Design a protein with these regions (language model features):
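Conserved active-site tyrosine of GNAT-family acetyltransferases
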Residues: 96, 100-101
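Conserved acetyl-CoA-binding loop-helix of GNAT-fold acetyltransferases
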Residues: 58, 64-77
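Conserved beta-hairpin
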Residues: 9-40
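Conserved acetyl-CoA binding element of GNAT-fold acetyltransferases
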Residues: 49-60
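Conserved GNAT acetyl-CoA-binding A-motif
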Residues: 77-91
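Conserved N-terminal entry element of GNAT/NAT acetyltransferase domains
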Residues: 1-12, 138-144
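C-terminal "cap" of GNAT-fold acetyltransferases
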Residues: 109-144
């Protein structure tokens, strides 16, 4: 089971933890002294019921184990929003293409950062290129 824990210094950065809380209570976990595994981190901002993901990183030893999908599922189940917007890095195109198909999203041929190839919207929403550009600009001005 995935859990997001706010990083201590940044309000937009969250550690991705793999827990086994669904099997044991927190009291039992503390007694057994089981550690939560840190499997990566995610940076995102919420604005007007839209989540803007600026970076999702899963450590290499935990890749290809569907943790990325679990993070997206966690966002859908724990936050109230209309859609997720983000950009696709060249090395993560495969993952985001699968997410777009799985969650009925769409790809847009606009990007803010130089090392990205396009942007995506999950699930499919009517958002103009100007709105996407403004949201990406907003997130980059706050995060970077």
């Amino acid at each position: 089971m995935i859990k997001l824990q706010k990083y201590s210094y940044f309000s937009h950065k969250y550690l991705i933890l793999d827990t086994i809380e669904d099997c044991f209570s927190k009291k039992d976990l503390n007694f057994m002294q089981l550690q939560q595994k840190e499997i990566g981190y995610i940076e995102f901002i919420r604005k007007n019921e839209i989540i803007i993901i600026s970076y999702l990183h899963i450590y290499t030893s935990y890749r290809h184990k569907h943790y990325g999908y679990q993070v997206i599922d966690y966002l859908f189940s724990h936050y109230k929003f209309k859609c997720i917007i983000g950009e696709t890095l060249k090395e993560s195109r495969g993952f985001w293409n699968k997410c777009i198909h799985k969650y009925n999203g769409m790809r847009r041929n606009i990007y803010y950062s130089d090392n990205c190839t396009s942007s995506f919207i999950i699930p499919r929403q009517k958002i103009s290129y100007k709105q996407i550009w403004d949201l990406l600009d907003y997130s980059y001005n706050i995060i970077y």
